[in-house]
A protein has these predicted regions:
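Amphipathic alpha-helical segments of tetratricopeptide repeats
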Residues: 16-27, 60-70, 103-109
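Residue-level signature for tetratricopeptide repeat
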Residues: 4, 44-45
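Start-of-helix signal in alpha-solenoid helical-repeat scaffolds, especially tetratricopeptide repeats
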Residues: 33-36, 75
Length: 134
């Protein structure tokens, strides 16, 4: 439901749903789902403009993904892009970072081990939509 609200632009509802998932005791038993939820949480906070909190969330997400051996190249590319964007001053830099992310994700899409990430969320399509918005 959180992904549904995010894709439709209802970021506050997406945040409410993702917070409900984080409060659930069952989320800890599904590492794949928790990793996806943490990545989606980063995107939600980016979209609602919580850039100060995003810096902390990025560090916590990277630590979690590395500890569970779920820190793949796709996640690294998205997180590195978000790190650069929250420090960016103008939209030109932000747009350039999203263009670089799209190119990197396009090349990663060909990798067998990285292509499965699109089952949970299509980061390439999201980055291309962000370029159009800017």
């Amino acid at each position: 439901m959180s992904r549904y609200h995010f894709v439709n632009g209802n970021y506050q509802d997406a945040l409410k749903m993702i917070n409900l998932l984080f409060e659930s005791k069952f989320l800890k038993h599904t590492v794949f789902l928790e990793a996806h939820c943490r990545m989606l949480n980063l995107l939600i906070h980016y979209k609602i403009g919580n850039h100060k909190l995003l810096g902390h969330l990025i560090a916590a997400t990277v630590k979690f993904l590395k500890s569970r051996n779920k820190f793949y190249k796709t996640e690294a590319a998205v997180i590195n892009c978000l790190k650069k964007i929250i420090k960016a001053v103008d939209n030109g830099i932000v747009k350039n970072n999203f263009q670089l992310l799209s190119k990197e994700l396009t090349s990663l899409k060909k990798n067998v081990y990285e292509s499965n990430i699109n089952i949970y969320f299509n980061y390439l399509k999201w980055s291309e939509n962000e370029i159009e918005i800017l």
